[in-house]
């Protein structure tokens, strides 16, 4: 059996780039909660003792940007300079302007267009991917890397590993077998965890705790064997972290946000963007389409692409590829996709209920936008698809 290795990585909620994603989405949530028609393009950057939010926002809401920044940093665990940032003492800079009137007239006609008439907020192409190798219909390498990161945060916050600090990264290499286009995981080849820690803990204690409290609960035993390689804090020291260790910026973890290097990516980030930005809503609808194709048994693995022009409601193109795993020809699956999914931005917003505020988008901004078991992730709902199974 010929196999190959594939690797996916993830980062924790305390990674500087992910901190920025979460602040941008916390701002978006606050805007949508007060005004569901808010138009938001919110970027965040951070470095030692400083967080800046900037971008274009048009909203009827009264938004306390500084409070959102400080609350988000505090909830992650940035409560002192020792851990990389002090939520209550850091400088918060705000530079927000309104959405360009040129964009507004082209996309939503200054709020005069009906939902089916609303154009895409920009040009671009987005991809959705699904695979039958996990219950989440997501790649195993990505699922494990993401769950290791989430588990690191869990054992930090519940006190199991009190030496942990917010920043950290994970990476998992999986050995795969290609079964006529479908991906079959054989074993976990390598596990890498680099986590921020305090001064009091030894490297041996770090390794022991990570194996017992992080790796063991996350990675199924069937994938681990005596040949599995573990790199646990291989640099030897990771005390300085968060924005003190590295600058952070919204939108720099787009592969971690999606499929861990599998499938494809159009390049547009998600966080801080309202649903008229097809970088986000378009990527969500094609994930639902790809997942529904696989979950309905039409294929074992699938990628869907959609593309847009600014101001134009209808997509320019829709593409489906099942990597040779389709039960019927891809052109037939494409017809089914077009019949069952409305790719117009205004209709995607309604069908996926994307204007709701609360902390909905904040939840997406760490540990992945896809494969999550949460009712707020409406794009993860499998649509029933009718199709004729070919006669044997």
Curated annotation (Swiss-Prot):
Residues the entry annotates as binding Mg(2+): 9
Pfam families (UniProt xref): S-AdoMet_synt_C, S-AdoMet_synt_M, S-AdoMet_synt_N
List of residues binding K(+): 43
Primary location recorded for the protein, binned into one broad class: cytoplasm
Enzyme category, top tier: transferase
Alphabetized InterPro entries for the sequence: ADOMET_SYNTHASE_CS, S-AdoMet_synt_C, S-AdoMet_synt_central, S-AdoMet_synt_N, S-AdoMet_synthetase, S-AdoMet_synthetase_sfam
Metabolic or biological pathway: Amino-acid biosynthesis; S-adenosyl-L-methionine biosynthesis; S-adenosyl-L-methionine from L-methionine: step 1/1
Annotated keywords: ATP-binding, Cobalt, Cytoplasm, Magnesium, Metal-binding, Nucleotide-binding, One-carbon metabolism, Potassium, Transferase
Cofactor binding: number and manner: Binds 2 divalent ions per subunit. The metal ions interact primarily with the substrate. Can utilize magnesium, manganese or cobalt (in vitro). Binds 1 potassium ion per subunit. The potassium ion interacts primarily with the substrate.
Keyword Manganese among record annotations: no
Location of this chain's protein in the cell: Cytoplasm
GO cellular component terms attached to this protein's record: cytosol
Molecular function, one GO term: ATP binding
Highest taxon, organism lineage: Eukaryota
Binding positions (L-methionine): 56, 99, 246, 277
Its biological purpose: Catalyzes the formation of S-adenosylmethionine from methionine and ATP. The reaction comprises two steps that are both catalyzed by the same enzyme: formation of S-adenosylmethionine (AdoMet) and triphosphate, and subsequent hydrolysis of the triphosphate.
Protein family: Belongs to the AdoMet synthase family.
Subunit structure: Homotetramer.
Protein name, as recorded: S-adenosylmethionine synthase 1
Provenance organism: Populus trichocarpa (Western balsam poplar)
């Amino acid at each position: 059996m010929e196999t190959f290795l594939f690797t996916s990585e993830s980062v924790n909620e305390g990674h500087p780039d992910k901190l920025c994603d979460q602040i941008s989405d916390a701002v978006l949530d606050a805007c949508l909660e007060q005004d569901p028609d808010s138009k938001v393009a919110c970027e965040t950057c951070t470095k030692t003792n400083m967080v800046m939010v900037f971008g274009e926002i048009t909203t009827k809401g009264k938004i306390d940007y500084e409070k959102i920044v400080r609350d988000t940093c505090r909830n992650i665990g940035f409560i002192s300079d020792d851990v990389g940032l002090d939520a209550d003492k850091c400088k918060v800079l705000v530079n927000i302007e309104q959405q360009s009137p040129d964009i507004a007239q082209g996309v939503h006609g200054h709020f005069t267009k009906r939902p089916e008439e609303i154009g895409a907020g920009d040009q671009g192409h987005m991809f959705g991917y699904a695979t039958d190798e996990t219950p989440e219909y997501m790649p195993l390498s990505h699922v494990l890397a993401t769950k290791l990161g989430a588990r690191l945060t869990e054992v930090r916050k519940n006190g199991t590993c009190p030496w942990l600090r917010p920043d950290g990264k994970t990476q998992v290499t999986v050995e795969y077998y290609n079964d006529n286009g479908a991906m079959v995981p054989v074993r976990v080849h390598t596990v890498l965890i680099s986590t921020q820690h305090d001064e009091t803990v030894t490297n041996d204690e770090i390794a022991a705790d990570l194996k017992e409290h992080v790796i063991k609960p996350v990675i199924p035993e069937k994938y681990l064997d005596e040949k599995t390689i573990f790199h646990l804090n291989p640099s030897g020291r990771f005390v300085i972290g968060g924005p003190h260790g590295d600058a952070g910026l919204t939108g720099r973890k787009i592969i971690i946000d999606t499929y861990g290097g599998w499938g494809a990516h159009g390049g547009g980030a998600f966080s801080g963007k309202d649903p008229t930005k097809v970088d986000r809503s378009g990527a969500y609808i094609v994930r639902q389409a790809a997942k529904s194709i696989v979950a309905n048994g039409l294929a074992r693995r699938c990628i869907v692409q959609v593309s847009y022009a600014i101001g134009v409601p209808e997509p320019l193109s829709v593409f489906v590829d099942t990597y040779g795993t389709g039960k019927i020809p891809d052109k037939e699956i494409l017809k089914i996709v077009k019949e069952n999914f409305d790719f117009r931005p205004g209709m995607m917003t309604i069908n996926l209920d994307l204007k709701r505020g609360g902390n909905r988008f904040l939840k997406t901004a760490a540990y992945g936008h896809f494969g999550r078991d949460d009712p707020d992730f409406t794009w993860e709902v499998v649509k029933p698809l009718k199709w004729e199974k070919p006669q044997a």
